[in-house]
């Protein structure tokens, strides 16, 4: 999104500048460099003051410098040998990482999937547990629980002849969840972790007008932040969906801008609707909806609809009856940030650091909000 806005500004301003430059040049004086009038000088100075490099020849040649030609998300993951993509918010959040996983698998990367599970994991086969609080869910993992997104995904992956183990964690506090992640990192020799949020509440710092449903997202963020892993990222898919839970998305954009200034924003990356990754993702979501018809994922349903070009109040489940959805192309865009820089900006991460259980996390977040002297005022989009 930031790249699109910047491009529009440059095109419009350049067009206006060229009109003025053309008017001030006579045919016999076009060989030398054009004279820029005071209006153009003011524009370029203003852009430069905001950190943009206006002279292409002055751009640094450091190979680590981000380039429009290579999405920073993939550039950051390129050196990794073993990548763990984990659903930060629980339930079907891991599905939001599938388009990324498909692209990485296609490129030959070793990718593992994990999920903070809302299923009754205590009922699954004992042999599925590979460590305390870590279950390796396979297509044939037995459980009487009808709501089991991890097994549903494992079965779908197996049908596509893709790696079909989905690691699952029960809802926990920060300390045991960190231990579970640490086991996976060591067991799988992971050198890159990507937390994926279906929605945007993982990007909130705590002083916004509303935090949405942050418990699982922020627990995952705190758990992974303390791990020694070379690459740690957070990516959000489903911009706008959390408005249902009160999230103000102008404040989300404000947070992304602040992360950009800190060097922690890796940009936005759209999932092309006609791509193989989008087609597979839609199929996986449809399969999950068929497996859990009484509780399909509203989040993944909206994202899948967005990747197919749907717009507005799209109906795909009885669960959305009576609501007013606004499916749009922004929901099919990955917004990616550096995990450590995101964690450093969270105002209440230290409040939940020593938690053991999920209930403790809920209580600590509520206490933080109760003590907050003033929240940021929500704003409407000006356009």
Predicted features and spans:
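Short, positively charged and aromatic/hydrophobic N-terminal segments
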Residues: 11-14, 37-38, 44, 49-50
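Positively charged, low-complexity intrinsically disordered leader regions
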Residues: 55-82
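N-terminal phosphate-binding or glycine-rich loops at protein starts, especially the Walker A/P-loop
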Residues: 77-124
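Glycine-rich nucleotide/cofactor/substrate-binding loop typically near the N-terminus or early
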Residues: 105-106, 111-168
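Acidic, Ser/Thr-rich peripheral helices and adjacent loops at domain boundaries
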Residues: 126-142, 249-269
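Internal, conserved structured core segments that host functional sites
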Residues: 164-227
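A conserved mid-domain beta-alpha-beta active-site/ligand-binding segment of alpha/beta enzyme cores
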Residues: 253-318
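C-terminal accessory domains and tails appended to enzymatic cores
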Residues: 289-383
């Amino acid at each position: 999104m930031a790249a699109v806005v910047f491009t529009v500004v440059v095109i419009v301003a350049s067009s206006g500048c060229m009109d003025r430059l053309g008017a001030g040049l006579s045919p016999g004086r076009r060989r030398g460099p054009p004279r820029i009038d005071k209006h153009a000088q003011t524009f370029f100075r203003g852009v430069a003051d905001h950190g943009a490099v206006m002279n292409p020849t002055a751009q640094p040649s450091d190979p680590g410098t981000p380039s429009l030609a290579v999405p920073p998300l993939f550039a950051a993951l390129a050196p990794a040998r073993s990548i763990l993509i984990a659903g930060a918010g629980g339930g079907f959040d891991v599905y939001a990482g599938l388009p990324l996983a498909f692209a990485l698998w296609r490129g030959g990367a070793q990718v593992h999937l994990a999920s903070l599970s809302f299923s009754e994991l205590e009922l699954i086969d004992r042999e599925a547990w590979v460590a305390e609080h870590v279950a390796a869910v396979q297509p044939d993992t037995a459980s009487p629980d009808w709501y089991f997104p991890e097994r549903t995904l494992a079965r779908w992956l197996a049908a596509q002849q893709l790696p079909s183990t989905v690691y699952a964690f029960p809802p926990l506090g920060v300390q045991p969840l960190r231990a579970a992640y640490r086991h996976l990192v060591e067991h799988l020799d992971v050198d890159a972790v990507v937390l994926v949020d279906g929605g945007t509440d993982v990007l909130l710092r705590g002083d916004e007008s509303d935090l949405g449903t942050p418990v699982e997202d922020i627990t995952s963020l705190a758990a992974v932040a303390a791990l020694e892993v070379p690459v740690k990222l957070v990516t959000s898919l489903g911009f706008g969906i959390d408005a249902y839970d009160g999230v103000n998305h102008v404040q989300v954009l404000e947070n992304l801008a602040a992360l950009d200034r800190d060097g922690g924003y890796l940009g936005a990356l759209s999932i092309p609707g006609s791509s193989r990754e989008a087609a597979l993702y839609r199929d996986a979501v449809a399969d999950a909806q068929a497996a859990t018809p009484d509780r399909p994922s509203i989040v993944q349903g909206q994202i899948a609809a967005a990747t197919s070009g749907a717009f507005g109040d799209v109906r795909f489940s009885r669960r959305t009856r009576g609501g007013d959805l606004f499916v749009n192309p922004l929901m099919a865009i990955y917004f990616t940030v550096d995990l450590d820089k995101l964690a450093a900006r969270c105002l209440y991460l230290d409040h939940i650091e020593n938690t053991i259980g999920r209930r403790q996390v809920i209580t600590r977040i509520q206490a933080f909000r109760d003590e907050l002297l003033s929240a940021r005022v929500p704003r409407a989009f000006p356009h």
